[in-house]
Amino acid sequence: MITLCLSALRGLHRAGGSRIRLRMTLGREAASPLQAMSSYTAAGRNVLRWDLSPEQIRTRTEELIAQTKQVYDTVGTINLEDVTYENCLQVLADIEVKYIVERTMLDFPQHVSSDREVRAASTEADKRLSRFDIEMSMREDVFQRIVHLQETCDLEKIKPEARRYLEKSIKMGKRNGLHLPEHVKNEIKSMKKRMSELCIDFNKNLNEDDTSLVFSKAELGALPDDFIDSLEKTDEDKYKVTLKYPHYFPVMKKCCVPETRRKMEMAFHTRCKEENTIILQQLLPLRAQVAKLLGYNTHADFVLELNTAKSTSHVATFLDDLSQKLKPLGEAEREFILSLKKKECEERGFAYDGKINAWDLHYYMTQTEELKYSVDQESLKEYFPIEVVTEGLLSIYQELLGLSFEQVADAHVWNKSVSLYTVKDKATGEVLGQFYLDLYPREGKYNHAACFGLQPGCLLPDGSRMMSVAALVVNFSQPIAGRPSLLRHDEVRTYFHEFGHVMHQICAQTDFARFSGTNVETDFVEVPSQMLENWVWDIDSLRKLSKHYRDGHPITDELLEKLVASRLVNTGLLTLRQIVLSKVDQSLHTNASLDAASEYAKYCTEILGVAATPGTNMPATFGHLAGGYDGQYYGYLWSEVFSMDMFHSCFRKEGIMNPEVGMKYRNLILKPGGSLDGMDMLQNFLQREPNQKAFLMSRGLNAS
């Protein structure tokens, strides 16, 4: 689902607090106030610390702000005739790197620390720094010097990436309203600060939510014993079930008691309902107002300007066309699910209401998979112990991309369950970066799956390269006595997807931090990781990823073939649900006065054909709305058009473990980071314009 980038340069990929991008440039002679931070930017080192106390976080936040502001103040007073590439554009890159690295240590702990006070201090630091980012991004004096540089320097003598950096700086200055009258700029600045705080609070509420429900063993009917044994028991000999993914989805997929599923679904989609509904009611109009002041019709128009889709009309056409193509498939899948429900109600003596409720969907989609393809995910997960999956995943990525991974002994980490790996180029031995694996749920931890970019891979002032550092943060089930953590196949797919983002972060080799890693268009950022999901549907790859946790015997070929064949199961309803979320996101960001819960309910009925549960407000739990995907959730489906085209035209055709194709992918898609437009990278790889054929086929549709 989601990557996150925590620097001031980046918006978030999946969820988490919204980041205002620090886009201004600074002069080289102004760099001295940050020399104390030079130890954080040594080439080939991971310089991140995870042991800061709440007081240290607060102190270092103020120090970072003071040091950086002094630099901006100096740059803002450079005489225009003295502005050069060297004292403006180049030094910006130096200072951005230092700022990013320090900021990461201050704002990342809110997502992963086990200490509530550290998380609180980190959240406050994030808010404070986000306000500061906005102040600095709207410094007209610095912007004037960037504009003057563009007008006076010989652009032909500047490297292409530096020229792109300059152009993007001008573009972002205008998108911040620096060309507008003073009173308008002040209004925009004030609203942006408020928007930033609202986004951080929205996702903090979700991360800190600790709602749980209590059920008897009978109320958890049909759930496997190992799952029930893993639950915390109450004094009344009942079981505590949280709303975290490792609890929620097994209950929704396997529990045969409709009332239990209803209670879980109701609770899941009313998480933070009161506070986050209020936040959305403030956030959406603020976004709309800022867009209007900047000259855009809607907030969606504002954000799409920088994406490959370019316009709301292109997005609407894409979603509506796909919805119509999937409509017959969705109807057929709903009819089959209703037949399953009717039959089960008769067998179990339940009242049959003649409809699919929201709490029925996962349950009967799971039954569909088991009946049509003889795939039982609960039994299948015994072949996916996390150690075996991790070993296989790392092996595949190393072979495919020409890399080697080495686990770091006694690594400095934020929790004892976290591991750290170093990534090297297999041919040259060059260290490219490091990544953390944080695999299990904890109280207060970010509760979805994401890749966080922590340290940018870019050039330093002395011309050496800072290595990239990323963290893969997921929430797989904890190991229990006598049994390791076992992954469902969809969790294996999630693991592959998020690790694809990690590889994008590590393999990018850019000059500027602004273009490092996953800093590409939001509707292109999922392309590399989605493409790599295809490996978990390949029989040979699955053999590398699996082994029974008890005796080590492999999955039978027959079961592997059934699993691969099941890829198309429920694809109509699953894709229609993505369209629902995309349409809701677009609607709320083209008409901020709409009621979010009502809009979601409308599209659930019209497109998915399954009504939302009355009293719930799914958008209040939808972290993407406040996490950098505002007006851009369509990007998941949009980018899958590109990822499927790449896979089927190159990897499927020439061999999915073909090292030449893997290196071509690494060099043409991953290595440029955001230094090239996404569509240019794609066409370089495909040697043609992309098309939808492979994507439509992956959805069980006729490509013609």
Swiss-Prot record:
Keyword Mitochondrion (UniProt): yes
Biological process terms in GO annotation: proteolysis; regulation of gluconeogenesis; regulation of skeletal muscle fiber differentiation
Transit peptide: 1-37
Domain of life: Eukaryota
Modified residues (N6-acetyllysine): 664
Annotated positions binding Zn(2+): 497, 501, 504
Keyword Transferase in annotation: no
Localization terms from the record: Mitochondrion intermembrane space; Cytoplasm, Cytosol
Group of enzyme by EC: hydrolase
Record's GO cellular component terms: cytosol; mitochondrial intermembrane space; mitochondrion; plasma membrane
Free-text remark on how the cofactor is bound: Binds 1 zinc ion per subunit.
Record Pfam families: Peptidase_M3
Assigned EC number: 3.4.24.16
Cofactor(s) for this UniProt protein: Zn(2+)
Record's keyword terms, sorted: Acetylation, Cytoplasm, Hydrolase, Metal-binding, Metalloprotease, Mitochondrion, Protease, Transit peptide, Zinc
Active site: 498
Known catalytic reactions: Preferential cleavage in neurotensin: 10-Pro-|-Tyr-11
UniProt-recorded Gene Ontology molecular function terms: metal ion binding; metalloendopeptidase activity; peptidase activity; peptide binding
Function: Hydrolyzes oligopeptides such as neurotensin, bradykinin and dynorphin A. Acts as a regulator of cannabinoid signaling pathway by mediating degradation of hemopressin, an antagonist peptide of the cannabinoid receptor CNR1.
Family the entry assigns: Belongs to the peptidase M3 family.
Protein name: Neurolysin, mitochondrial
